[in-house]
Amino acid sequence: MGRHVTSSPRLAIIGTSDIAMFHVDAAREAGFSVDHVAARPQSSTVDDFARRHSISNAWADPQELITKSGEWDALIIASTTESVLGLLQLAVTSGKPVLVEKPVAVHSSALHGLDLSNPSVLVAYNRRFYASVAAAREFLGAGRPALVHCEIPESVRRADEGRLVTAPVRLNSVHVFDLLNHLLGGLMITDSRLIEPGRPDNGGYMTCTSKRGDLCSISTNWNAPANFSLTIDRDGERFELRPLEIATVYRGMEVIEPSQEIPIRRYVPQAVKKIVPPDHEVKFKPGFVDQARALRGLLEGTRSPIAASLTDARVALEFAERMLGLMN
């Protein structure tokens, strides 16, 4: 059953970064009244954030805000990755809906102490809510198993002392690992390797299979001048996310005969459909409004089938760790 809340449920948020700002704007669009904000204890930014975003109550201690759960109906945790897990462990004791920023923890093993099936916790993998991703899932579900390929040209560099800085893989690439898990209904890794053993910064690949038989390859082409992308090939059609916010469906090829200007025959894929972000995804950070609506849905007794769970967060981290295990 849903909880009894006012027409504008009260939201509390922990965090004052740009991501927190996007959450505030999206939550208001979804019908929340954003009444409370906290940051790290004795934060120097929380009062200014509250003033700039017209939030009436600024808290000096995020843990105190969480324990005063009678003051709010739902909570967003958008603080630093290192602080998220402890705050979440406290927040779940309230029994109230929580939206927590990905990846939740730095290591998947840190999640083992949580109830990963807790229905009141959503993980903020906002790309699941893209119109392009919904179309990709529909495309996959409409036919036989497909051939799926994903490029992850993450920025991976070496620190001054030569150590490989892999934090972006845990903090950002996990978005793509989660998308694959979401689209294909779970994946089993069948192989993973580097291009050159001992040269992890050169990148590598993973291959996976889904339960229904889709074959998936993942290129971790670090630092390549390319967009994150995902392609699905099946029965003479290609569904492409490039960048992930925009989907294009291709069917057939146009043959352009040689000319005096270009003396070679060209084969051009024919785009038959394009899916672009709807207006509310353009005005706000893509996926955030529908994600906030999913949080509000928990108050009304409805769990979004799209939103990520803590189990999904663990799976995404395990994918990242499989690749990072080759790199370390």
Language-model region placement:
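Short active-site oxyanion
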Residues: 32-36, 72-75, 167-168
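NAD(P)-dinucleotide binding in Rossmann-like oxidoreductases
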Residues: 215-290
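Beta-loop-alpha module in the N-terminal Rossmann-like domain of NAD(P)-dependent dehydrogenases
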Residues: 23, 53, 57-114
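Rossmann-like dinucleotide-binding domain that binds NAD(P)(H)
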Residues: 158-227, 231
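C-terminal helix-rich "cap/oligomerization" subdomain common to oxidoreductases
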Residues: 1-8, 38, 52, 64, ...
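A contiguous active-site-proximal alpha/beta segment in oxidoreductase catalytic domains
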Residues: 82, 105-160
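N-terminal Rossmann-like dinucleotide-binding module
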Residues: 1-53
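Internal, well-ordered alpha-helical segments in soluble enzyme and binding-protein domains
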Residues: 110, 129-136, 144, 172-180, ...
